Structures are given as structure tokens and as C-alpha cells.
């Protein structure tokens, strides 16, 4: 099986656009630095084409074995494609154990099928950064920050809850001093007038507008009775039994003689109905008054 079986044809449309964008991110200066580093560690020459020299995975496996001895147990020297893919897979497993993050590692086809050389370069740079943290002298990449663990007493941790972090912004030394709870009264006055602070609760600041001397004096709670009269007429206060003329007139009507709602009432007209008379106990009904209840004819 020849290696041409794994070579892809030219890309078109969106695939070509994505491939071009990835190729534009490839850094040739970083490639030269990685070449010098790998050749210096392994002692083997990669070749003119950097990615083609790493494609069989042999140099990559020897390289990780130099950084971490025993990482790859067997390196396949065969030119068959599946042996070369196995070398690349073993290299990926080895650098994962070495400490490179999974999201920084390329896939085997990115190198073997030439689909994403930029990701391969990013993986080698991440490997260089990890090698620096392990004490290797590397001039490529950026050294990862080392952990600086600290242990604090529980009392110190509780004190930290009272501090506002600068990452959350600053209150510019503002505080809640002088603030009252929501809904409580506030003393409002205009400090520009030079007056003292008011002692009563009826002062309204001029900054809030003016009430023109209005107050709530004489006002009653909602639903209570109000005495309504016209002060211009010079009359005294009306009592609660009279209805103001402004509200209309009841024409002398009252509730006299009215009973409680639901009680029985005797309804008759005295012009047409006689006063009912009932026979006494034991008296025959026919011997009673001719205009009694039973014999009114």
C-alpha cells in the first residue's frame, strides 16, 4: 500500500477557504526555531520540508523519548502507512502523559494527510513550553506558570469576605453611613440656604420641589366619615345625621319603622281591611261578632 492512497485531492469552496485561513496562521519563524530544537535534541536531520520530515513519526517518537525516556516502547521504521500512523499515535499518547493539554494536541490526520499544519506547529510549541517547566533548556515557546499554592487559616478566609476585590471595581470610598432603611423617614433640607438641619419630620427639600405650604392637617383615613359644609355661608359644622345639600336631598325620609332585613312583616291596608279579631279559646266561631275573622259576610 503506497502513501499516495492517503493523499487528498485539492479543496474547493468552503473547504478551500478554511484551509487557506489555517495556512495563513502558520509561522515560518517558529518552524525554524522548532527545527533547530528537535534536530539538536535528536541529532537527526529533518530535511528541507519540515512537515514531510515528521510525517512518518519516527523523529517525533525519538524526540519524546529524549525528553521523557521510555515514553514510546517501540518505534516502527517501516514505510507502510499504518506503521507511520501508529508512530504518530504513540507520540500523541506520550506527550499527553508528558503534560500537554488535550486541546493543544493535533490529530494524526492533521500531519499525515497535511490537513492542518498550523495545529501541528501549535502542539510542538505547547510541548516546548511544557519542557521548560520540567527544567529543559529550550529557546522556543513560553514557559508555563508554576503553581504557587498557599494555605490560609480559617480566620483569614473569613476576613476576606469583608473585602471588596479590585476586580469587582471600586466604591471610591463610598459607604452607607447615614442611610436609612427603605421606607423610613428622611430629613430633607437645602444645605445652600445655610439653615440648620430640621428637627421635624415635615420639611421637604427645595431640591425635591415645593408643596406651597400644603399639609395633611385635617385629613382623615380613607373610608372614615367627613363633615361637609360651606364655610362661606357662616354655618356651623353639620352633624353626622344631616345630609349636605351638595349631596342632594332625602325629602324628609328616614328609616323609622324599618325592621332588620329578613324579619317577617304584616302587610295590609287599613282603608280596605278590617282590624282582625280572633275568637277566644273555647268560643264557637259562628257565635262571634258578625264581622269577625271567620264570618265577615
UniProtKB/Swiss-Prot annotation:
Modified residues (Phosphothreonine): 170, 180, 184, 259
Residue stretches making up the Calponin-homology (CH) domain: 28-131
Domain of life from the UniProt record: Eukaryota
Keywords, ordered alphabetically: Actin-binding, Calmodulin-binding, Phosphoprotein, Repeat
Xref: Pfam families: Calponin (PF00402), CH (PF00307)
Family indicated by similarity: Belongs to the calponin family.
Role, per record: Thin filament-associated protein that is implicated in the regulation and modulation of smooth muscle contraction. It is capable of binding to actin, calmodulin and tropomyosin. The interaction of calponin with actin inhibits the actomyosin Mg-ATPase activity.
Protein name, UniProt field: Calponin-1
Biological classification of the source: Eukaryota, Metazoa, Chordata, Craniata, Vertebrata
